[in-house]
């Protein structure tokens, strides 16, 4: 799949702002639709600007994205997607903190479950109360 670093960052922020959850995007996962198939995102750690620069340098053109959520008409404010809004917000935040993208990306790779009151793993929801009254040494998820 063609998802890149900025897609991962934007998805993380969108999940928090619009989905009320902390979520990321996996670099590799098993398909839920096709048994035995793996989905791989080889551009997972590559910045969108670097991809665009590389394409320009090699005189390559992008094909139209099949994802309807990325389509928007810049001249019409009604058609600007939530992802575009998040992209613009991150660009503004980057002026204040140049490391904002790196920090958002790293935050989903260093989640501290000890400080989260709730989490979901493999579709099963848990709360801090699952281990709060039990064995303090048993912190397994």
For the regions a protein language model found, what residue spans apply to each?
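Mid-to-C-terminal catalytic subdomains of enzymes
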Residues: 4, 46-106
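Surface-exposed, flexible loop/turn segments at secondary-structure boundaries
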Residues: 7, 70, 112
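Secondary-structure transition/capping residues
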Residues: 24, 97-101, 115-119
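Active-site adenylate/phosphate-handling loop in enzymes that bind or generate adenylated species
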Residues: 1-49, 104, 121, 125-128
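A short, terminal or domain-edge coil/loop segment
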Residues: 10-16, 54-62, 87-91, 119-135
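AMP-forming adenylation/ATP pyrophosphatase catalytic core
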Residues: 29-36, 58, 106-141
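Phosphate/oxyanion-binding loops and surfaces in catalytic or ligand/nucleic-acid-binding neighborhoods
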Residues: 15-20, 96, 107, 111-114
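Membrane-targeting and insertion segments and their boundary/processing signals
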Residues: 25, 74-78, 135
